[in-house]
Structure formats: structure tokens, C-alpha cells
Amino acid sequence: MKIILAVDGSDNSYEAVHIMKYLARAEQLTLLHALDVSRPAYPEMLPEVAEEIYKTLEQSMKEDGERLLKRVESLLPLHAGPTTKQLRIGSPAKTILSMAEEQKADLIVMGARGLGPIKERLLGSVSHRILTLAPCSTLIVDGPVKPVKQILLPLEGPSDAEAAVRFLRLKPFHEAVELTLMTVLPWTEPPWPSGAAAEAAATEMLEKQTEYIESVAERLRAIGYQAHGVAVVGTPATMILQQATTLRS
């Protein structure tokens, strides 16, 4: 498995480093730090002065970046796998996505920036862009890392299931994990049919969803995972959070 571990020196970035102890040995592990060096925005400044300031800032950030990568490398678990360090200049999101394409990565690991919902909507977080646009699986770490023993895997449909099975075939975890596969059937009372007929229709749809999620769980059990399926009716976000709470208790 080819992994890109993107770091920026934040607390969540270091938590992303810590989660590597729970991932399997990488075929290739790339430590990536992207430098977004802004040029001075002062029109009245002489071009040569602005360029000198830019070069000084860039050199300082490069030195800080190299120290960060060395620090991260020293924190990796012994089983992390062959590691290379990459320090690149450019937009963090574009740089990470470009490297994922370039290296044909199987997984991108990084920490969330923690902008908050308002700033994230206005500016767009790096992690959100990676999650949306990455050509491979992504693992976004938001908060202190705990041992990875149970995984809740919500699936919306066949394309989700195929992507999940494809990734899990890589055996990405260092130790055995228990998988709970979940599908949520959003349901509102239709104008027709009504009463007992509507209830029967909902029951039939839930049975089909249960069969579907169990069939995916069976595929994962066939490749060595402990897996079971859960199908429920309700609002997806609410039901997923409730299931996560149940698994933690």
C-alpha cells in the first residue's frame, strides 16, 4: 500500500502521525509538507525589495519544513515501511492531490485544520478538498487518536461498497479490526400507499437493505475480516452518529 502522510505541524497533523502505528506497513510512505509562500502585497514596494523579502521568507519556511519532516520521521512506528521526505512549494491541497496522482497512492493521511464550520464554508479547508477530490482513499484525523479496534463503515450504495471492499483488500490495518457496515434508509410517510400498506412497503425496503448490507459483510468476512451489517430507517447523519455512540459504549 502506497501512503502519503501530509503534515503541517498542527496538533491534528501530529495525531495523523500517531495513527500510523495502527496502519499496516507501507510499500512506500511519503512524508509531504507543502509550503504556501505568499509574496508581499505592497504595490509601493520596489520589485527587487519584494523579491528579496520573498526569498528570505521562502528560505526560512524551507528550513522550518525540513525540521518538521525530520521530526515526523522520528515519530513513525518501526513498522511504517520505506520512507521518503518531500518538501514542495505550492497550494497544500493542489500539492497533495498532485503527488497522489503522481505516485498512484492508495491512501492519503492528514490532520484536519479545525477551521470551524463558518470559515470552512467560506474558505474551504484543505482536508475537505482532499476528501472531495482525492483519486484514492483518505484518512482525515480530527482530534486525539485512540487504538483502532472498531470501524463504522456507512455505505450509501453499490459504488460505496465496491470502493470499500477494494481498499480493505489491501489489508490496511496493523492489527485486526471489527467492521460494522451500515446503511440508512431515509423514509418519510408517502401520500400513497398509507396505513398498513405504507408500513409493509417500508418493511420490504428495509429487508432488501438488510440483505444488501449483509452481502457486503459476507464479502469482507471471506477475505478475513470480522464484519456484520446494520440496516436502519431514519435520517442518515443522525442514525450514523447514534450507531457510533452505541459502538463506543
Q: Residue spans of the language-model regions?
A:
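A short acidic, glycine-rich active-site loop
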Residues: 51-67, 199-211
